[in-house]
Amino acid sequence: MASFSLPHSATYFPSHSETSLKPHSAASFTVRCTSASPAVPPQTPQKPRRSPDENIRDEARRRPHQLQNLSARYVPFNAPPSSTESYSLDEIVYRSQSGALLDVQHDFAALKRYDGEFWRNLFDSRVGKTNWPYGSGVWSKKEWVLPEIDDDDIVSAFEGNSNLFWAERFGKQYLQMNDLWVKHCGISHTGSFKDLGMSVLVSQVNRLRKMNKPVIGVGCASTGDTSAALSAYCASAGIPSIVFLPADKISMAQLVQPIANGAFVLSIDTDFDGCMHLIREVTAELPIYLANSLNSLRLEGQKTAAIEILQQFNWQVPDWVIVPGGNLGNIYAFYKGFHMCKELGLVDRIPRLVCAQAANANPLYLHYKSGFKEDFNPLKANTTFASAIQIGDPVSIDRAVYALKKSNGIVEEATEEELMDATALADSTGMFICPHTGVALTALMKLRKSGVIGANDRTVVVSTAHGLKFTQSKIDYHSKNIKEMACRLANPPVKVKAKFGSVMDVLKEYLKSNDK
């Protein structure tokens, strides 16, 4: 078609090729000249609405499964090729015979019957829909998560599909970066990325209970976000939830969530590592299913955030992805999601990963600085504003090391002052982030300053929770109420008398200071 300038009365209509879900193809357009009257969009056939007495689960039962003969099993994590040890996902098992972590292994031979274009088109076709269960960002990748679970057993709040936004001002003004993005996993059902994994875990528990497996309730140790997700998804399914929390070490916003959702909450006089030790002992004795990231099912949901990032970039691979790390399951989950996409032909490479830790809880950072040559040494985590990653003995240390080695990854740390300043700086550009994202941004700033991350590198910072869960830390910072911290970016309210002249004086001074 010859190109030419269009009059104002011309209307663009996507051609058939644009709407056929073919990735990497440039959009082509048909141009129709119209009269001055308002353009009438082309009529598309509407999907018939289901009958009033039918819900979306009923509708899903009538829909045949698109793909057959896909499966997944538990296997020992990073086992040698000669290993034959494996377990059905319907077994209640958390570790291998040797005590090693487990991993969910998918049947790649079956998945490879379909090429990368097929998977890209399938996943893209489900975005923005309300078909059960594909309206979820997790379950829109069901074939790569729990391929054998019945749709009726799935417990979902249509989590995932979280915002990936361009951090334009922060990137340009403070880092001289043009391509900085934030994947805001905190925009989710309970306000953190933990929803992704908990939907998968509670769905499998729902299936196990229907199979009369010995599961009365689900339990977890938590620094806040895990308990919020567990209690919400269990409440949705009518399954009892039991939560072990370290006393006086999480925010009130985090504490109120499991309480409101009806969880049985134990506030225990210890830290997270102590709670984790106790819940593992308890679940070994009682019919309580363990929901911590020792359980590899959670990571199957969390890996979908990595797939979403690729999808949101039209299947182009970013150069860097920076993930806050505490118990360290999430850094491995991101690696696994990227690796599956490469292995199955959706992309041709994976990004480099950065795990960001608080300096007050930095066992992985210290292990990394040793070149991973020395034996890993857990430590006693000190108090950090990034409370969800205040963990000194991470369960997934082996998974994290594996992911970092495979992705040519880096580990960086942030002091309390650095993470709070980074949080305040990001907030001043229109974000409202959690302290853990402040840790990740600090890592980015250090790597940018050292030249490891370039000005033109497409970089994604993973924001793991919503800032509204951590308002007290923001209040303390802007009130300059944090001991031994300058709070140099504090923005406290200005007290002024209720007089026009007083208000005008203050405003003139403010405007003068900003007129630079």
Curated annotation (Swiss-Prot):
PROSITE patterns: DEHYDRATASE_SER_THR. Keywords: Allosteric enzyme, Amino-acid biosynthesis, Chloroplast, Lyase, Plastid, Pyridoxal phosphate, S-adenosyl-L-methionine, Threonine biosynthesis, Transit peptide. S-adenosyl-L-methionine 2 binds at residues 163-164. Residues 1-37 have a biased composition (Polar residues). Gene3D superfamilies: 3.40.50.1100. It holds the Pfam family PALP. Residues 1-55 are annotated as: Disordered. The modification N6-(pyridoxal phosphate)lysine is found at residue 194. Homodimer. This is Threonine synthase 2, chloroplastic.
